Amino acid sequence: MTQPASVRWQLWIVAFGFFMQTLDTTIVNTALPSMAASLNESPLHMHSVIVSYVLTVAVMLPASGWLADRIGVKNIFFAAILLFTLGSLLCARSETLDELLISRVIQGIGGAMMVPVGRLTVMKIVPRDQYMAAMTFVTLPGQIGPLLGPALGGFLVEYASWHWIFLINLPVGIIGALATWFLMPNYTMQTQRFDISGFVWLAVGMATLTLALDGNRSLGIPPIAIFALIAIGLIALLSYWLHARRNERALFNLRLFDTHTFSIGLTGGLLARIGSGMLPFMTPLFLQLGMGFSPFHAGLMMVPMVLGSMGIKRVVVQIVNRFGYRRVLVASTLLLALVTALFALVALMQWIWMIPVVLFFLGTVNAIRFSTMNTLTLKDLPDPLASGGNSLLSMTMQLSTSLGVSIAGILLGIFSQPHIAAESGATHTVFLYTYLSMVVIIALPALIFNRVPPDTLKQSTLARKS
């Protein structure tokens, strides 16, 4: 990839944004037990720290591309980095869980805009024939983030404090914001009117239903308010459906669901990612509270999972071409349920030596399923609907992760005692029952993926979309 120096600097700016966002998604998980102790909260009720961020990203994603086109990629990317950095500072200064959750929402608004606006920036600054090479360059730091995050988070918690997992964003964010302001051009595009009504209906529906899912246990919301939240959420989603039926310029066109593979991929992927979303949250908790590992040791133990994920991506295309979408999705879903069951066995038998092996296979199977799900969902969409389908898929991925973490927190709360100590028999029982429940949830999408139609032209389709 040969580019002028100015363009290379702009690509580096986007790459830094990708790195900040992906690092944050993994660095926090390892620190949750220490954060709980500092804030006088139960470590099994800290999932709201993850949910608040991921749900905010899901809600804000649909607006990010339109804002970038209307206001300019430089202005929005600059604002995104500032918001993310400000949110990080506020997270580090939080003294209560409520303060931390508000700060995570601010951080999530910035995080929601960084990655999609970064992609849009790359599209505008490089020729189309060099787009793939440029995206490979800017996403490489994003692949390093998940690898570095758990170990770095554990190291900072163990040898400094949990506040530093947020403070390390400050110098990177300040440098990134200054570089964006002085080096990035402010591309704009003529835009159609933004579907504000559809955006509000979807945002209200997602937020209220997610809050209702765990509001009683985590936030102490009374049952009558929970029922009200559920009613508001369902009414909001129904209102969006009615709105989109009569509006061709709706945020997400309902004609997307006329494509059979998109419908199966989106619904199956939503349920599948609910199950998968539980695992990155559960694993650091299990290693620290269930197995008695230090934060740094627990973070290092997560590395095999990332290595398994990165290693298998090179051969996913060949696997799908050989066996087809339906077989790969059904088999990988059931294999993931089996690997999750092995966590229950580890909790029961205390087989510490088995943990890196289980985590490696967890990362491998997850990567196969994710890549195949994403490709299946988008591969048959007509070109006019492809952009909207991709945006809806991105939003659904974040929403399902939020739901998965919420459900994992609910399961932990159901099975836990009021006070537990690391390495206690009660703790092992909590994780044993939680993992066994997760096995059922993770296996369920196999029923949906079994409806994938017979594969045709697998190689050309996957190679073009992956």
UniProtKB/Swiss-Prot annotation:
One GO location term (cellular component): plasma membrane
Family listed: Belongs to the major facilitator superfamily. TCR/Tet family.
Membrane topology, record value: Multi-pass membrane protein
Name of the protein described by the UniProt record: Putative multidrug resistance protein MdtD
SUPFAM superfamilies: MFS general substrate transporter
Entry annotated with the keyword Transport: yes
NCBIfam families xrefs: efflux_EmrB, PRK10504.1
Keywords: Cell inner membrane, Cell membrane, Membrane, Transmembrane, Transmembrane helix, Transport
Main subcellular localisation: membrane
Domain of life the protein comes from: Bacteria
Natural source organism: Pectobacterium atrosepticum (strain SCRI 1043 / ATCC BAA-672) (Erwinia carotovora subsp. atroseptica)
Cytoplasm in keyword set: no
Example GO molecular function: transmembrane transporter activity
UniProt xrefs under Gene3D superfamilies: MFS general substrate transporter like domains, Multidrug resistance protein D
Entry-linked InterPro entries: EmrB-like (IPR004638), MFS (IPR011701), MFS_dom (IPR020846), MFS_trans_sf (IPR036259), Multi-R_MdtD (IPR023721)
TM regions (residue ranges): 11-31, 48-68, 71-91, 105-125, 137-157, 164-184, 194-214, 218-238, 262-282, 292-312, 328-347, 351-370, 402-422, 429-449
Family annotation (HAMAP family): MFS_MdtD
